[in-house]
Amino acid sequence: MNIAFLAHDKKKELMVQFCTAYKNILAKHDLYATATTGRLIADNTGLPITLLLSHKQGGHQQINARIAYNEIDLVLLFTDPNTTDVWDDSQMIETIRHCDKHNVPIATNLASAEIGRASCRERV
């Protein structure tokens, strides 16, 4: 299973905690992330992550392209509902739209990520 990770700045630590808690499950899958999020996950968990560009340099577009080419099976995108960064929000919304268009499950918070994690376990 190919899993992509993205997170608003204020949610990166939560993403790291999630990946730390489930690293034994995640280690059985191919993992992709934008640069900063991916480095944080890799540095804190030891998980091998394919690092894409940072979101401001096109990392979201790289993930969106992989979604469009059916190369991503699950997206974990932890969002900050209180963000005021319109550009950042537009990038996140575009990724959500790609997931909807190509029927790829997406988790935007911890509760929905738990459902995705359960799916990972079943698909190993």
PLM regions: where:
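Mid-chain, well-packed structural core segment of small domains
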Residues: H60-H98
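Short, acidic/small-residue loops that bind anionic groups at enzyme active sites
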Residues: Y32, E94-E114
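Histidine-anchored nucleotide/phosphate-binding helix
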Residues: E13-N24
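Residue-level detector of conserved catalytic or cofactor/ligand-binding positions
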Residues: E114-V124
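Short internal beta-strands
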Residues: K28-T37
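Short hydrophobic/aromatic-enriched beta-strand-loop microsegments
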Residues: D30, L47-G58
